[in-house]
């Protein structure tokens, strides 16, 4: 219940800082990829979002981040980028059409100028 559209999208995703790290208790030293939960908390606050299940703090003060909760903002960010891309494609099409019209006008002007010069050269006054 209480379903509404997410307000977290591209702005939120752009503020996140992807990092690589190794866990303190991992003797294998494997590199992991993620984000810093404390930084996510600050970004959420900057986006006006609090009281979310995305982040929890354990009794020991350890931050836990539910990475699955990042999927919806990433989907919204992709949708926002798609809309922006579509708008840019439309604008590009308009510019290409305008360029084509202008190129045609330039050709007409060149042809008219050539005809005018040829007319002056071939006029009886110049012979």
Question: How would you label these PLM feature ranges?
Answer:
Residues 18, 26, 45-48:
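Acidic glycine-/aspartate-rich tracts in secreted/extracellular proteins
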Residues 33-34, 63:
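Residues that recognize and position ribonucleotide moieties
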Residues 1-3, 51-127:
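C-terminal intramolecular chaperone/auto-processing assembly modules
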Residues 1-6, 20-33:
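Active-site-adjacent substrate-recognition loops and nearby beta-strands
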Residues 37-59:
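Active-site and glycan-interaction determinants of carbohydrate-active enzymes
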Residues 3-15:
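Periplasmic N-terminal gating module of Gram-negative TonB-dependent outer-membrane receptors
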């Amino acid at each position: 219940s209480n379903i509404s559209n997410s307000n977290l999208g591209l702005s939120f995703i752009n503020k996140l800082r992807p990092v690589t790290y190794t866990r303190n208790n991992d003797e294998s030293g494997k590199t992991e990829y993620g984000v810093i939960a404390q930084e996510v908390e600050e970004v959420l606050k900057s986006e006006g979002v609090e009281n979310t299940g995305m982040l929890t703090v354990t009794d020991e003060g350890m931050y836990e981040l539910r990475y699955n909760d990042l999927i919806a903002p990433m989907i919204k960010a992709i949708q926002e980028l798609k809309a922006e891309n579509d708008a840019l494609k439309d604008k590009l099409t308009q510019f290409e059409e305008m360029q084509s019209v202008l190129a045609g006008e330039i050709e007409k002007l060149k042809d008219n100028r050539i005809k005018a010069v040829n007319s002056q050269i071939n006029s009886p006054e110049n012979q």
